[in-house]
């Protein structure tokens, strides 16, 4: 009987221990767990809400586009080898009459050019597909930055193209254009960005630098080792795109000033030296300046290869014209190289110069793709000193047809599409 009472007492004490001590602990644990879950849920909901709140439509669009471009192995693709494809859907990238900043000089349709097919050719690389040009995506990359074209009138041509390619997505009143003696600056207020052009046809100092000496009527005189005067204006840019070619093609020699500066009077003391020697010297001066003044972690450097001319129609087997004035189609047979007179020796000097520097320089090989575009020049539909060509001038294409510069919209837009690929995806 006592044994039974002892067992009952132990059972009673165990139950009492559970009720008094363990049960409250268990209930407290349940309460704390539920409270934690509630707080975690509230925290996760808060974070998700904030995340969605800060994703703008532009950012979502950019994400989607980045996912698509993952399929494009641009880093393995030679985007400069390909063919021209007629594309009425995506090209032209803008309309001539919708770009308020397009000058009469290259507005060929406005100036009476009757055909427009030259605006509708898209460059298709051989080994990859390219994402469609997205002006908003490019402007996002340029936000808070400065992009500068430096060189001759071909680069001014390309700068105008770039301005027209992006300006349509910028609200009215948020974009301005300013011209100075050496520069043209397109300011994009909404993005705190600028796209500018700096006139330096030889990169180094020359007598063709002043505004009243740019018509090509005066033989150029240069100082091959003097670049700092120009370079001071380049230092704070985030993207520098250089070119120098067309002024080198006039003669087999070029005049080199004996003095160190043009400021010491109008000296005629100069030496005439072969263009290849001086071109190499100028590019050496240029690359040394870049190495001493440009931080490659902050500034990206590009060099555009030679923009070809089409001044002999016999080069492409057409003997009824004299230059490019009757051309409305590209050369579509790209299975064999074409010789339209591009100075390949200058090309090789430039290519080698960009390869042998301490700072990386992206060589934009626009030459071959452009050699097939005999149809794209301003020809009779540009302007000379702000004046359209007269009927009498059009009877003399050998003298007056401009087969150097390019109509816009047109070929320079394709150059800028490829430049934009480097800026958006490769850098």
Curated annotation (Swiss-Prot):
Pfam families according to UniProt: PC-Esterase (PF13839), PMR5N (PF14416)
Motif (DCXHWCLPGXXDXWN motif) on chain: 402-416
A GO CC annotation given for this chain: membrane
The keyword Membrane is annotated on this UniProt entry: yes
Gene Ontology terms, MF aspect: O-acetyltransferase activity
TM ranges: 12-32
Keyword field contains Cell division: no
Function of the molecule: May act as a bridging protein that binds pectin and other cell wall polysaccharides. Probably involved in maintaining esterification of pectins. May be involved in the specific O-acetylation of cell wall polymers.
Additional detail: Contains 2 motifs that are conserved in esterases, but it is unlikely that this protein belongs to the catalytically active pectin esterases.
Descriptive protein name: Protein trichome birefringence-like 30
Gene: TBL30
